[in-house]
């Protein structure tokens, strides 16, 4: 039983490492290609009433993360 748990743990670690290496923030679609990002940026823009926030959210992954974090705190 312990050996099968160890094997599963090693497999999970390998899968996590491969996933992390092959999917980066740059791979995420911009607002033109990604519906989730577009919706999140629009909601953030409605909260701030500043069109510049929408543009920043669409073009910068860090701004997108901050916007999503702020929206999650409101819920």
Curated annotation (Swiss-Prot):
UniProt keyword annotations, A-Z: Disulfide bond, Ion channel impairing toxin, Neurotoxin, Potassium channel impairing toxin, Secreted, Signal, Toxin, Voltage-gated potassium channel impairing toxin
UniProt keyword annotation of Secreted present: yes
PTM field: Contains 3 disulfide bonds.
This protein's record includes keyword Iron: no
Gene3D superfamilies xrefs: 1.10.60.50
One MF annotation (Gene Ontology) recorded for this entry: potassium channel regulator activity
UniProt note on tissues of expression: Expressed by the venom gland.
Signal peptide from the UniProt entry: 1-23
Record GO cellular component, one term: extracellular region
Subcellular location: Secreted
Family (UniProt): Belongs to the scoloptoxin-03 family.
Role of this protein: Inhibits voltage-gated potassium channels.
Protein name as it appears in the record: Kappa-scoloptoxin(03)-Ssm1e
